Each structure stands twice: as structure tokens, then as C-alpha cells.
């Protein structure tokens, strides 16, 4: 019998991703990107809960079950409200007792 996983609600996933982003961004983003993010976030910033992609294995080298993870993007929106400048993509496990996360940072 498979264990039923209680999925993260979007607001919780967004909060987790944003907290981790703020803590780790200085070590993983260029200073110019951090400055851009800080200057533009209030006007154009977004933290979005998106459908979990099934190609994370290409990014992290491990196959994952998209049903067991939430995906959150942090970036800036353009004038069409599309996120065209993604600073980080987060993959966060739904398992509260063993929370894993992976991050793909802007290069």
C-alpha cells in the first residue's frame, strides 16, 4: 500500500522557496543580479507556484516523481506579466518530515 503524501499548498511552497532564496542568493547569484532583483522586485517581482516539470533529472541528475514535489520560480515579470528573468527555480518535496529541495540558479 502506498503512503499518501500531503501536498504542500502553494502559499507554503512559495514561503519556503522565498525564505531559502533570500538566505542563499548572495552566495549563488552575481552581485549585479542581486542588485537588479532588489531594485525591481517591488514593481516587477514574482514568486510563482508552477506545474512541476518532469525534466528535473536533466538539472539535478536524479529522476524524481513530479507528484512528490512542488516547483516554485522566483524572478521578474515583463510588461506582458510573463516571467522572463528567472533567478531561481525550486523543487521542494511534499514530505514534511523529510523536506528536500533542489535549486537551479540563474547562470
From Swiss-Prot:
Transmembrane segments: none annotated. Pfam families: DUF440 (PF04269). InterPro entries: dsDNA_mimic_put, Put_dsDNA_mimic_sf. SUPFAM superfamilies: Putative dsDNA mimic. It comes from the Bacteria. Belongs to the putative dsDNA mimic protein family. May act as a double-stranded DNA (dsDNA) mimic. Probably regulates the activity of a dsDNA-binding protein. NCBIfam families: PRK05094.1. This is Putative double-stranded DNA mimic protein Asuc_1259. The lineage of its organism: Bacteria, Pseudomonadati, Pseudomonadota, Gammaproteobacteria, Pasteurellales.
Amino acid at each position: 500500500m502506498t503512503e499518501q503524501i500531503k501536498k504542500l499548498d502553494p502559499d507554503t511552497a512559495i514561503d519556503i522557496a522565498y525564505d531559502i532564496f533570500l538566505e542563499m542568493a548572495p552566495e549563488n547569484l552575481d552581485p549585479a543580479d542581486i542588485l537588479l532583483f532588489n531594485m525591481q522586485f517591488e514593481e516587477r517581482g514574482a514568486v510563482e507556484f508552477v506545474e512541476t516539470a518532469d525534466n528535473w533529472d536533466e538539472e539535478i541528475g536524479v529522476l524524481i516523481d513530479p507528484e512528490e514535489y512542488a516547483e516554485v520560480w522566483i524572478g521578474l515579470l515583463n510588461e506582458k506579466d510573463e516571467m522572463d528573468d528567472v533567478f531561481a527555480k525550486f523543487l521542494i518535496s511534499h514530505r514534511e518530515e523529510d523536506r528536500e529541495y533542489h535549486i537551479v540558479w540563474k547562470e
